[in-house]
């Protein structure tokens, strides 16, 4: 079992993956860094391996599918999940891990919305969507989660091994937040700085289609947990 596992799902992140891997290896020297490549065509996997990551593959497209394989295959005392786009600061990882190992948190949310997200993010409808999803999730499920859609979290072993990954795409962030709330797991928020993607790096999230899927996930889980 790893002491700390850093899990990085990637699809065509050749411009940033080397830096992300190197940054997390630097701030968490006791961690094993895993990059799960999701059919990249730009050399992401090779670059990640060259930077020192353990590279594995998921051939079913979609972030949820990648996370299902990650959570099934990797055993660790604490986990960091982070996107490979270099928008999240590795420097916050030790504090997030400490919340899991020291305070027994099951999920630690890297909260962008209380920091630099609204000034750094150049997609205004993403801002509105984040606010809407946060309001709906907290209001309907009784949470105090500051950032539902963040791609930066820490988890306990208990969370990872009891969470049934159902969603295939970007709805996964909302789904796992609701799972933690419904299971009365300990959730903490850690404020992090956020920076927009570097020039030439493109988001895989579609504001409208993925946004409707997220709202549909909230409705589906509300029906499941609160029939």
Model-inferred region functions:
Residues 12-26:
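Short, well-formed alpha-helical segments that are part of the catalytic scaffolds
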Residues 32-34, 45-73:
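Conserved donor nucleotide-binding strand/loop of the catalytic core
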Residues 143-144, 165-168, 177-195:
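Catalytic donor-sugar/metal-binding loop of nucleotide-sugar-dependent glycosyltransferases
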Residues 59-73, 90-170, 196-217:
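Acceptor/aglycone-binding surface of glycosyltransferases and processive sugar-polymer synthases
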């Amino acid at each position: 079992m790893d002491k700390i596992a850093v899990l990085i799902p990637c699809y065509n992140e050749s411009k940033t993956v080397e830096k992300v891997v190197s940054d997390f290896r630097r701030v968490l020297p006791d961690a094993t860094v895993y990059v799960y490549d999701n059919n990249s065509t730009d050399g992401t996997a090779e670059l990640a391996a060259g930077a020192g990551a353990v590279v594995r593959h998921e051939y079913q497209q979609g972030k949820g599918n990648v996370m299902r394989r990650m959570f099934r295959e990797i055993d660790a005392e604490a986990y960091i999940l982070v996107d490979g786009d270099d928008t999240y600061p590795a420097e916050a990882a030790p504090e997030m891990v400490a919340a899991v190992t020291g305070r027994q948190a099951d999920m630690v949310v890297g909260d962008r919305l209380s920091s630099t997200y609204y000034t750094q993010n150049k997609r205004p409808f993403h801002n509105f969507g984040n606010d809407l999803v946060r309001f709906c999730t907290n209001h309907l499920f009784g949470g105090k989660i500051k950032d539902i859609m963040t791609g930066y979290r820490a988890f306990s072993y208990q969370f990872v091994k009891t969470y049934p990954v159902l969603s295939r795409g970007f709805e996964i962030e909302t789904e796992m937040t609701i799972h933690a709330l419904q299971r009365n797991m300990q959730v903490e928020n850690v404020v992090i700085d956020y920076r927009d993607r570097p020039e030439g790096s493109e988001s895989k999230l579609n504001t409208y289609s993925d946004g409707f899927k997220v709202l549909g996930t909230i409705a589906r889980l509300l029906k499941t947990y609160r029939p």
